[in-house]
């Protein structure tokens, strides 16, 4: 038998798949339209990919934690708890992620010598936050799913 966590990791790979594919195309088109520098393109793409991983993990984790097995209409696939908690959690995650990625480098206006350090620290914090969110959401979902007894 396959572990619940491995099952959720496989589902996460499928849920996350649109972000690298569609996200790259959209970021590339917007960068071309804005005549953005290559570094700005890479920064935007990294932000889309990291935040996409976090939001996908949250949605998947909440869906696994509060499953509905008796749905017949795809619109009623989510339980009320999963449908209410997931958007709140991933909007909070997005807010914190944006505060980290834009807030720390903005402090460089006060201390210009630390601009590079603050930028690197902000990206490392975002990577750490995303890893923590993905691990937490999937672990929570797997633990709750393991408790489900099908009758």
For the regions a language model picked out, list residue spans one by one:
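Hydrophobic alpha-helical transmembrane segments of membrane proteins
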Residues: 3-151
